[in-house]
Design a protein with these regions (language model features):
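Exported/periplasmic ABC-transporter solute-binding proteins
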Residues: 6-36, 40, 54, 58-62, ...
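Conserved beta-strand core positions
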Residues: 18, 44-46, 98
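A short, gly/pro- and small-residue-rich
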Residues: 83-90
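Short secondary-structure junction motifs
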Residues: 41-45, 88, 182
Length: 238
């Protein structure tokens, strides 16, 4: 599933629209980054297209009009890069790690990965081709915990919604999602020995008609200002 959003509501016939395909977990920081970038680059509108990294990689492979692609994992960026669809090598611009999320108030008193194996607990994730689903499987394997998920959501936002609404008891998401939830769910830390480092690469699509603006957007994210913005939303610097 792909969600599209403009970073600002201003309209101008002279504007260049920069199509940024970004992982769902980047929704909030990229929305703010888009607004900040537009202020520094009059005449450029940042159009965010959000979805699971696996879906976005497939869209780019199928010729979608993307200028920039930001993935929540290296594997999906590699799919694009291996087909020579990038203008230059991708770069890591942020990292993330995982947390368990539970319904506000933690009614089932979940405190560890082992608690997630309770057969009466409703656990949701995504398919393993979506980065958060793949990372979740890696974490559970490290911890020696076996779980049969009750449902598979299309992306990390789906996991958040299911748990926040009480339709599910628990899930595993990025730390940045817990920050963005602003108290709608509770986060439970996963020990470092079981956790992973999710690397977020970004690349410019080779057939972009706006290479200059695309490079400027990437440079903005890598700048101290862009990195501070990402950190504000729970991401780590690479």
């Amino acid at each position: 599933m792909l969600f599209s959003a403009c970073a600002s509501s201003s309209e101008s016939q002279e504007q260049t629209t920069l199509e940024v395909y970004a992982a769902s977990s980047l929704a909030m920081p990229f929305a703010e980054a888009g607004v900040a970038f537009e202020k520094e680059h009059p005449g450029v509108k940042v159009q965010l297209n959000l979805g699971a990294s696996s879906d976005l990689a497939r869209f780019v492979q199928e010729g979608a009009p993307a200028d920039v692609f930001a993935s929540a994992d290296v594997a999906n960026m590699d799919k694009v890069e291996s087909q020579d669809l990038l203008d230059s090598a991708s770069v890591i611009f942020a990292t993330n790690y995982l947390e368990i999320i539970v319904e506000k108030g933690n009614p089932l008193n979940i405190s560890s990965l082992k608690d997630l194996s309770n057969p009466d607990l409703i656990f949701v994730t995504t398919n393993p081709d979506v980065p958060i689903g793949k990372y979740t499987a890696e974490v559970l394997k490290k911890a020696g915990v076996s779980i049969t998920p009750d449902s598979f959501e299309s992306n990390v936002k789906g996991i958040m919604l299911k748990v926040a609404s009480g339709e599910a008891d628990a899930g595993i998401v990025y730390h940045s999602e817990v920050i963005a939830a602003d108290g709608q769910v509770e986060g439970i830390k996963i020990p470092t020995e079981f956790n992973i480092v999710a690397k977020y690469p970004i690349g410019i699509i080779k057939n972009t008609a706006h290479r200059k603006q695309a490079q400027e957007f990437v440079d903005f994210l890598l700048s101290p200002k862009g990195q501070a913005l990402l950190t504000q939303y729970g991401f780590k610097t690479p």
